[in-house]
C-alpha cells in the first residue's frame, strides 16, 4: 500500500487546488501475531501457592498454502489495466461464462457479448435487451444460457454460444434478482426471479412461457438481495434485506430444504450473523468445489462461510473506518488522493451503489477477489493474507468483477501427445491468459487486468482506452456548436512584474483546457492576479482572483473535466499544468513547475510548456515566502497575457 511522506510544502486543507508534492511509497504488512501459551518444561515438586506468574508466549507458526506461487501465476498480476472498452451508458454488470464469453450490461438496458481469445477479447454482438434499467443478470452454471431482468417487467433469455435471444418472459411485476437454478442434466432449464418490493421468488422454465412453475411467498419476508446456485450440491442460497439467509432446492427436489447439508436448524449455524449485525449480503458466490460460501455485506465486511455447516470461517473488515484508521497508522495514499477516494466511497453509499460490488473465487477456491477503495484485493483464504492489490494507482473505483482463467478454447484440431512433446514454437505460444474484467463507478467503460502491463503508455498510438462507440447526437451537436470562430491558440506570453514567460500550448491534446486558458487571457481575467503560492524547487501557482487558493472558475462557470494525454507528462521542468481539488475540478488556477514532477501525472492536466523566459520562472520561484502559507512577502503579479 502506497504511503506519501509529508513536508512543510505539502498542500494544506484550506487550499482547494494545489498540486501534490513528492512523497515516498512503501508496502504495509499489518498481520496479527497470535500467541499460544508455552508449556512448562520443568515440573517442580513444590506447587505454587496463589496465582501463577505470567508465562512466556510463543508466536504461532504462520500457515502456508502449498503451491501458492503456482496458483498466483494463474491470476492477473499487472498493477494497471491493459485495455478498456465502452458502452453508451454506465456499465453496471459483468459476467464471465464457462464457454469463454464475457457479457456486459449497461444502465440503459443494453447488453454486449464479447469472446475471449488467446490474448484479449473481441466484440461479438450487441442487444437492446430492455427499455429501462437492467436490475440483474445471470449465467447458467455450464455457461449455455444467459438472462437479464429489467424495470420494464421483462426477462430476456439468450443462448450464449450462438449469441442469440431465444425467449422473452413478461413477468407482470418489477423484478429484483434473477438466477439460473438448474444443473446440467436437469429436464427443465429453471430460472428464479424475485419481486423487487417483496420477498417473493418465482420459478420459471427459461425456455417456456410466462407461467411460474412455483412461487416462494413465505420463504422471505423482505426484498431479496441475492439468489445464487451451488451447482456442486444442487442447492440454492438466497438472502434478503433483513439479513436472513435461506437454503432451498429447485424442481428436481421439489423446492425443499437440501438434504446434503450438515445442519437442520439455523441456530446450529452462523447464518444469523448478518441479522445480528443489522446488515445483509450484497454479493454471494461459491468456491469451485462448493464447500465455501463468500459474501460481501452492506456493512462492507467480507464473510466466508463453510457451505455444508453454515459456520463462519473468515471475516475481513473493509469498512471506511478501518481504512481511515489504517491511513492514520501508516499512510497508504497521499492525503489528497485518500480524501478524494473517501468522498467517492461516501457517494457510493449515498446512491446505494454498494449493492453492485461483488466477490469472486479463483479456480482453486483458495483466493477471493473483490474491489475496494485501494484497488482489487486478492486474499488468500487459507493463510488469511492479502497477497496482491491490483489497480491501486488507477483513477477508477472498481465495482463488479468477472474472472477468466485458463486458455480460451478455439476451433482447432485436438492437441495430441506428439504436438505437446514437439518443439513447435506456434504450439508453445498458446498460454493461459488470466484476465479480470471489471466495471467502475460512474464509468461507461469496463477494464481488463491481465499479466501484461499496458504497452508504452507514452506512445500516442497505443492508447489502452479503446473508443468502440460512436459519439451520441448530443455530443456531435455540442462539438459542432463549439467550433464557430477560433477560440484557441498554440502559444502565449505571460507578462509578469518580474519579466515575460513565453509558453507553447497543446490545443489538439487538451482542447478544453487550452480554450479555457485562451478565452480567460483574451478577456483579461488573469490581469492583476498574484502568484499566491510559491514553493522553491517545486512550482509557482497563480490564476486565483481572490489570491487565497480557493477561488476561480472556468469560462463555462464552475469546473470542468481533466484532459490527460499519454504524450504530455510532468517529466521535465517548466511544465504548465492545471491546479485542481481532485478529479475533474479544473477552474482557472494553473501552475508552472521548476523540476520534473512525475507523481502529478494523471492527476493534473498538462496543457503547455515554457519555451522562453525560464530564468523568469526561476526568479519567481526563489522569492521569499511565508513558510506557513507559501505566499510571497512581496506580491509578484501577472500584468496581462498575450495570446498569439
From Swiss-Prot:
UniProt similarity note: Belongs to the cyclophilin-type PPIase family. PPIL1 subfamily.
An annotated GO BP: protein folding
The keyword Repeat belongs to this UniProt entry's keyword annotation: yes
E.C. no: 5.2.1.8
Subunit details: Identified in the spliceosome C complex.
Organism taxonomic ancestry: Eukaryota, Metazoa, Chordata, Craniata, Vertebrata
Regulation: Inhibited by cyclosporin A (CsA).
Residue list for modification N-acetylalanine: 2
Domain PPIase cyclophilin-type: residue ranges: 488-643
Any Gene Ontology CC annotation: nuclear body
Catalysis performed (reactions): [protein]-peptidylproline (omega=180) = [protein]-peptidylproline (omega=0)
Spans through the membrane: none
Annotated Basic and acidic residues bias: 17-29
Name of the protein in question: Peptidylprolyl isomerase domain and WD repeat-containing protein 1
The keyword Transport is assigned to this record: no
InterPro entries in the cross-refs: Cyclophilin-like_dom_sf, Cyclophilin-type_PPIase_dom, Cyclophilin_A-like, WD40/YVTN_repeat-like_dom_sf, WD40_repeat_dom_sf, WD40_rpt
Cited function: PPIase that catalyzes the cis-trans isomerization of proline imidic peptide bonds in oligopeptides and may therefore assist protein folding. May be involved in pre-mRNA splicing.
